[in-house]
Amino acid sequence: SGTPSSTGTDGGYYYSWWTDGAGDATYQNNGGGSYTLTWSGNNGNLVGGKGWNPGAASRSISYSGTYQPNGNSYLSVYGWTRSSLIEYYIVESYGSYDPSSAASHKGSVTCNGATYDILSTWRYNAPSIDGTQTFEQFWSVRNPKKAPGGSISGTVDVQCHFDAWKGLGMNLGSEHNYQIVATEGYQSSGTATITVT
């Protein structure tokens, strides 16, 4: 229950909000690049945030706000490509679950002064921007993560990650779909207010 899934524009930014409906979640656009997401109930999967559509390799993305997860959650630059269908994450912070623990480690890269582990994994018959599909996920996971539980801010040089992925044979699709700073929750609870620039 809560805010129904939707996409659109607000304050000059693209937003995407998706929930499987199992958890109790409220997503609110605050104007500009800001959004607030509150979720509870420790069930279901949800992801929402603001950014751009289409995404771009050359973008430098800054974010600031508060991120207070309880349980499994990510705060990341999150997006999709088509041709090939790829879901990607540049994870800045996360809750109780390290997303790199369930993926295949490919290497590491230093971007914006921080080290990120690079991973990939396949998703089978899973939700995507094109309905239920089988597709690859690309991950950069900041190690160590930025501390959750309060104020958080940072800048992500997207090109740095995309180039590192390409150097490891991880090729994104040729057509970019959305690219947002997303808060994701899985069978957890929490709150986040994030402003993207």
Swiss-Prot record:
Which PROSITE patterns does the entry link to? GH11_1, GH11_2, GH11_3
**Domain GH11, chain residue ranges per copy:** 1-197
Q: Name one GO biological process term.
A: xylan catabolic process
Q: How does activity depend on pH?
A: Active over a very broad pH range.
SUPFAM superfamilies per the UniProt record, alphabetical: Concanavalin A-like lectins/glucanases
Q: Which residues form a coiled coil?
A: none
MF annotations from Gene Ontology: endo-1,4-beta-xylanase activity
Hey, which family's this protein in?
Belongs to the glycosyl hydrolase 11 (cellulase G) family.
State whether keyword Ion transport applies: no
What is the protein name for this chain? Endo-1,4-beta-xylanase A
Q: Which gene encodes it?
A: XYNA
- Name the PANTHER family for this protein: ENDO-1,4-BETA-XYLANASE A-RELATED (PTHR46828:SF2)
Organism of derivation: Schizophyllum commune
One Pfam family this chain carries?
Glyco_hydro_11
Q: Name one GO cellular component term.
A: extracellular region
Record-annotated active site? 87 (nucleophile), 184 (proton donor)
Q: Which Gene3D superfamilies match?
A: 2.60.120.180
Pathway field of the UniProt record reads: Glycan degradation; xylan degradation
